[in-house]
Amino acid sequence: MAVVDVVRRGREGCCRDLLADGPQTAVELARATGLHEPSLYRLLRSLTGFGVFTEESPHRFALTPLSSTLKTNDPSAGRELVLTQQWVSRAVAELPRVMASGETGMQLAFRMPVFEYLTQHPQQSADFNRTMTAFAAAELHAVAEAYDFSGAHRIVDVGGGTGALLATVLGRYPLVSGVLFDRPDVIDEAHATLTEHGVTERCEAVGGDFFESTLPSGDVYLMSHILHDWDDDRCAAILRNCRKTIDPKGRLLIIEMILPAGDEPHPAKMFDMYMLVLSGGMDRTAEEYRELLHGGGFRLTRIVPTQSPVSVIEAVPDLDGA
């Protein structure tokens, strides 16, 4: 989803024209346009990160010099847009209906959730996994350098994809073992990564469903770019499943971008729109993660920044709430 595409589709909701008379809240704009207010708020918030709107106070938006000059009939708007995956393009094209209904672009375009679509389309799934691996490559060493894993014994990477992050951590900590857990079709592609990093003797690869399956036991659970794929209820289900098997003295490490408060530019604001369109998930603020973890039986202990857009959110089992 290119910025120009979000800007163009945001203007289709007439927000620019409505804000021409002065700042308004997301609730007021939703009422005037008939759009789904939570989805509209997230769209407007994402655009503040690129100077299109400004959030003058919580949930209250105003025009910037950039949005004041946008022309709704400009034929060149969005002409540089390049979407490399056709199925993603189709989902993004549903953004106006997403804004009106609150459904995902995948549901509107394909009548199925994104991960069901990927399961049914192996080639698209393989391309998607390679794209995610390439995207996360810059984060791998940043996470491994920022967080001290030396006290870990057995790391379980929940939804770990092809294993690049876990393999990187195990490569730095030769006394630590690991378990890579993901869908069986994803695990099939992970063996090459584990072999390449020389960690196959210390790392199991287990297929399953992190909603339903009994997770492998461990003292450190790792989840990288998992929770942002899901809404709060589904995240709580994942966290509760982790809580069942994690060591009572263990740690849960969540690798995600954290949304800043206000209109500070941050890439998480744009990726939040991807989540809205593709999966119905969301990127979250630190306080939202704190509340989410509490609902899943964990207590947030600290947030460790890295030399990349992501942070390591550390949590421990909430023994008082057990």
Regions found by a protein language model. Name each.
Residues M1-G49, T54-S57, L66, F149-A322:
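Alpha-helical subdomain
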Residues M1-Q24, E28-H153:
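Conserved Class I S-adenosyl-L-methionine-dependent methyltransferase catalytic core
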